Amino acid sequence: MPREIITCQVGQCGNQIGMEFWKQLCMEHGINPEGILEDFAVNGEDRKDVFFYQADDEHYVPRAVLIDLEPRVINGIQKSAYSSLYNPENIYIAKHGGGAGNNWGRGYTDAEKVQDEILEMIDREADGSDSLEGFVLTHSIAGGTGSGFGSYLLERLNDHYPKKLIQTYSVFPIENDVVVQPYNCLLSIKRLTLNADCVVVLDNNALTSIAVDRLKILQPTFSQINSIVSTVMAASTTTLRYPGYMNNDMVGLIASLVPTPRCHFLMTGYTPLSLDQKFNSVRKTTVLDVMRRLLQTKNIMVTGAVKKGAYMSILNVIQGDVDPTQVHKSLQRIRERKLANFIPWGPASIQVALSKKSPYIDSGHKVSGLMLANHTGIRSIFKVLYDQYRTFRKRDAYMNIFKQTKIFEDNLDEFDSSDEVVKSLIDEYAAAEKMDYINWGNDDDDMQFDPREPPKFSNIQ
């Protein structure tokens, strides 16, 4: 039985990458922009019901809630070819339409004001599911709506659905994208640490470099970057939609990648990557070639994260017509060449999930691969943002912007709490590189968690 997943798209970036994700899913499942199943896709062996439901007229509708505090992006979706795909009851645009002004505090406060309306949408979707497994949140952590509204939504989902999984696709910013982004990011990372079960980190710097260096696009547009993100999102859900023997639900995917509760931030790699089939590389794709390329720094979508540190876990999702014996031989070669450095206290193994490719898309290559990896080097992206925050905070730079919002009008305790959580997260990823990690935090009476505690999802039946 399919286990359904509800997607929440929050803010400009969240809705843009969400839109590209649904376009990709429609193509892969043979669904046209109006939600009608194409004649050639009637007898498919896929699980559409994980992400879609069928309305009374049998057209497919995404299990999605679209949220923004300013209308431009969602209005664009409603005027696009996919306008009739979504359930209009699941769209929220703030009546004031003024956005959050790149202020986490405004986004968070606005979310609190309309929480009943948003939760009613989500509850309605949940009630329409036979066996809801969890939620996916798409957002950016740099601006105001994706970060602030997204943070509040994470807290409420965790409270409201304590036994359901929460996975996010979180876009981390380009340097100096928003002047107050160090504040917005720190406050968001606290919620991603405490209220999500798995966070896929999408680094805008790395995505831009990949577009320039690998796809030879001199000035990548938002649409082209979002297309790369949608490729990763679709590939990471392919085992749920085209199930095999393993990793065919969200629990299985996350459990294989997250060894301890807070170390749940993942990086991704994808190959071969192309936005236009005409520009596909002329090369023979083999399992070994794909798996070797996935470990190369230039293919990883977090800047510089794997240059230092060690892998805690790796899951490669290989799509295409693949002989399992090729996988075994490829893993042996990678082990012999020591292409991946693992932490000393866990299994040094790459897990592989084989998945079918959509029969409705001609990708131009026989084998493609996605790497989902938990690597201690991910802390470098947190450290950069944390250091920027500390620099701003010492000078109280731009703090008056936040003091104008309800959550900060009396005190700045929320900043201090977020500082502590993010610093602890950075320290834990550093400690995870050492053999005695199992004892990390035992001497600290103020620790809010035990790193040896099993993740939430391990107890879900």
Curated annotation (Swiss-Prot):
Output the Gene Ontology terms for molecular function: GTP binding
Tell me where on the tree of life, at the top rank, the source sits: Eukaryota
Instruction: List the GO terms this entry assigns under cellular component, sorted alphabetically.
Output: centrosome; cytoplasm; gamma-tubulin complex; microtubule
Q: Where does GTP bind?
A: A142, G143, G144, T145, G146, S147, G148
Q: Does the keyword Hydrolase apply?
A: no
GO terms of biological process kind = cytoplasmic microtubule organization; microtubule nucleation
| Job description of the protein | Tubulin is the major constituent of microtubules. The gamma chain is found at microtubule organizing centers (MTOC) such as the spindle poles or the centrosome, suggesting that it is involved in the minus-end nucleation of microtubule assembly.
Tell me what this protein is called: Tubulin gamma-1 chain
Source taxonomy:
Eukaryota, Sar, Alveolata, Ciliophora, Intramacronucleata
